[in-house]
A protein has these predicted regions:
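Short, glycine/acidic-enriched capping/hinge loops at junctions between secondary-structure elements
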Residues: 40-44, 61-64, 123, 211, ...
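Generic alpha-helix detector with strongest preference for long hydrophobic helices that associate
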Residues: 6-13, 42-46, 73-76, 92, ...
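Thiamine diphosphate
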Residues: 56-192, 203, 436-440, 446-479
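N-terminal glycine-rich anion-binding loops that anchor highly charged ligand groups
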Residues: 27-42, 53-66
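Carboxylate/His-rich catalytic cores and anion/metal-binding grooves
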Residues: 39, 45-52, 434-448
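Flexible, low-complexity linker and terminal segments
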Residues: 2-31, 35, 174-429, 434-435, ...
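Short glycine-rich or small-residue beta-strand-to-loop segments that form or flank ligand, phosphate
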Residues: 47-53, 78-82, 110-115, 144-146, ...
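Secondary-structure transition/capping motifs at alpha-helix termini
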Residues: 37-44, 68-77, 98-107, 132-138, ...
C-alpha cells in the first residue's frame, strides 16, 4: 500500500526536496529562500533584499511577501515596499555596495526588484547607472518586470524588454512556473558572474498559473564558462570607477560573459529535432507553450515532427541572444519561423547572427516571405494563428495532405466570430471604497482621472475625462 505524503500548507516555502504545488507569485516568494539556502550550503553568509512597487501581474507579490514574513526572517531576507519603482531600484543598487565602506555583516546581499511595465520605464535611469556600476560577486540583482501584454489591468499593453535592452541588461524569459524558479537561480548566478543586473520577464500567463514543481537542490547546477577569460580586476562593482571604464567593461566583457554563461548552462536549447529538418521554429517563454499547443492542433507530436522535418529552438535568454547555439541550430534548415509576442526581439538578432554565414535559411516572423504581416506585434498571439503560420510553411515544404486538411480547418476557425460574453459587467468601485465619493466633482466642473482604480471614473456619471501616467495626476492642468 502506498503511503500518503504528509503535506503542509507551508511546504511551498519550507520543502527542500521533492515536488510542491504553488502559483507563480508564490514561486517568486520562494525564490530568494532557495538562493539563501544554496549560499549557506556553499559556505556563504548572505542576506536578501527585496523592494519594488506593486502592479499587475505582480499585484499580489508584496501581499504574499508579508504573509511569508517569518520565512523571510529565517533566511535573513528583508522586504521593504518602495515609495516608487525607481527609489526601490536605487535601494537595491545600494545593497550591492555592502562592504565597500568598511567591514560588512554579510558576505553579500542578493536583491529582487519588482514592478510592472510603466515602473520599468520610470526606472530606466537607475537601471542604466546600476548595470554600468555592476554587482557584488556574492550578491546579484534580479529585476522582475511585470508585463501585461493584453492590457487587462493597465493603461498600456506593455512589453518591457526593449527598456532593458537599452540599459544593456540581459533578459530571461521563463515558460511556466517551474522556470520561474530555475531561471531565477540562474539569474542570480549570472548576475554575480557577469556583474550585470538580470531581468526576469513575468507575464500573467506565468504569474497567475499554478503548477506542481520540482524543488530539488540538484535541479539547477550552475556551470561556469571555460571559454571566457575574465579581464584584470573582474567584472564586479568597484570604487572609484570612471564612467568610460564602466562603459568599456559592459560593452567588451560583461555581455560576452553573459553569452558564455548561457552557453555553459544550456539555457537556450533544442527541444525537438530530427535528422533532415527543413523548418526550424525559434521561440521563447509563453510563446513556446503556444507553439506546442499549435503543433497539437496540427496533430504534430515529437515523432510526427521528425517525419515532417520540424525542429524547435527554445530561447531562455532573449537578449543578448547567444550566437553559437542558434547558428548550429540553423544548419541545414530551409526556413526559420520566429514566434514571439509583441515587437520582434529575437527575430532581428537571429538575422544578424545568421546573415554572415555562407548558407543560411530564410528567416520570417513578424513579416512573411513577401514582406506582409504574418505574426502581429499587437495584442497577444493565439495558438490557432501560430498553427496556421506553421501549417502554411509545412505544406509548402512537404505537401503533406494531413497538414493541408488541418490548415483548412484552422483557417475556418479563424474566420468564425469571437464568442460574445453571456453578460457584460462594467467595472465599478468596491463597496465602501473612498473613490465612491472622492471622485464626484462639483456641478459644472470637469476633472481628469488618474491611473489605477480612479481610471474607472471616466465611464461613470462624473464629468471626468482623460488620465495621466503614475505620479502625473493633475499636472495636465498646467498645460
Amino acid at each position: 500500500i502506498m503511503k500518503l505524503r504528509n503535506v503542509k500548507l507551508d511546504d511551498k516555502y519550507i520543502a527542500e526536496e521533492g515536488r510542491i504545488f504553488l502559483n507563480g507569485t508564490q514561486a517568486l516568494v520562494r525564490l530568494p529562500l532557495m538562493q539563501h539556502a544554496r549560499d549557506k550550503k556553499n559556505g556563504l553568509r548572505t542576506a536578501g533584499y527585496i523592494s519594488g512597487y506593486r502592479g499587475s501581474p505582480l499585484g499580489q507579490f508584496d501581499q504574499q511577501l508579508w504573509i511569508a514574513k517569518k520565512h523571510l526572517q529565517n533566511h535573513d531576507i528583508v522586504f521593504q515596499s518602495g515609495v516608487n519603482e525607481d527609489i526601490a531600484a536605487t535601494a537595491l543598487w545600494g545593497a550591492q555596495q555592502a562592504g565597500m565602506h568598511g567591514k560588512a555583516k554579510y558576505d553579500g546581499v542578493f536583491g529582487v526588484w519588482y514592478g510592472k511595465g510603466p515602473g520599468v520605464d520610470r526606472s530606466g535611469d537607475v537601471f542604466r547607472h546600476a548595470n554600468l556600476a555592476g554587482t557584488h560577486p556574492n550578491g546579484g540583482v534580479l529585476a522582475l518586470m511585470g508585463d501585461d501584454h493584453t492590457c487587462e489591468s493597465s493603461t498600456t499593453a506593455h512589453q518591457s524588454e526593449f527598456a532593458l535592452v537599452d540599459a544593456m541588461m540581459p533578459i530571461l524569459n521563463p515558460a511556466g512556473v517551474q522556470e520561474l524558479l530555475d531561471y531565477g537561480l540562474y539569474g542570480w548566478a549570472l548576475s554575480r558572474y557577469s556583474g550585470t543586473w538580470v531581468g526576469l520577464k513575468c507575464m500573467k500567463d506565468t504569474i497567475d498559473a499554478s503548477a506542481t514543481v520540482d524543488v530539488g537542490d540538484d535541479r539547477v547546477q550552475i556551470r561556469y564558462p571555460d571559454d571566457f577569460e575574465m579581464p584584470e580586476g573582474g567584472l564586479s562593482l568597484r570604487f572609484p570607477d570612471p564612467p568610460l571604464d564602466q562603459e568599456e567593461r559592459l560593452h567588451r566583457y560583461k555581455l560576452e560573459a553573459v553569452k558564455a554563461f548561457v552557453r555553459a548552462n544550456g539555457i537556450d536549447r533544442v527541444e525537438m529535432e530530427g535528422e533532415n529538418d527543413t523548418l526550424g521554429i525559434v521561440t521563447c517563454g509563453k510563446s513556446y507553450l503556444d507553439v506546442r499547443q499549435a503543433l497539437h492542433y496540427l496533430g504534430v507530436d515529437d515523432d510526427r515532427a521528425r517525419q515532417l522535418g520540424v525542429s524547435i529552438y527554445k530561447v531562455g535568454m532573449t537578449w543578448p541572444l547567444e550566437p553559437t547555439g542558434i547558428a548550429h541550430f540553423a544548419k541545414g534548415l530551409k526556413k526559420i519561423l520566429v514566434v514571439e509576442e509583441k515587437r520582434g526581439l529575437l527575430e532581428s538578432q537571429v538575422k544578424d547572427i545568421l546573415y554572415p554565414l555562407d548558407q543560411r535559411p530564410v528567416v520570417i516572423g513578424k513579416k512573411d516571405e513577401m514582406g506582409l504581416e504574418l505574426l502581429r506585434s499587437n495584442g497577444a498571439l493565439e495558438p490557432n494563428e501560430i498553427a496556421i503560420a506553421i501549417a502554411e510553411r509545412l505544406l509548402e515544404l512537404t505537401g503533406d495532405q494531413s497538414i493541408e486538411e488541418r490548415l483548412t480547418h484552422r483557417r475556418s476557425l479563424a474566420l468564425e466570430s469571437p464568442e460574445v460574453p453571456a453578460m457584460e459587467r462594467t467595472p465599478y468601485f468596491c463597496s465602501g471604497c473612498p473613490h465612491n465619493t472622492g471622485t464626484k466633482v462639483p456641478e459644472g466642473s470637469v476633472a481628469l482621472s488618474g491611473i489605477g482604480c480612479h481610471f474607472m471614473a471616466q465611464w461613470m456619471d462624473r464629468n471626468t475625462t482623460g488620465y495621466t501616467q503614475m505620479g502625473g495626476e493633475g499636472a495636465s492642468w498646467i498645460g
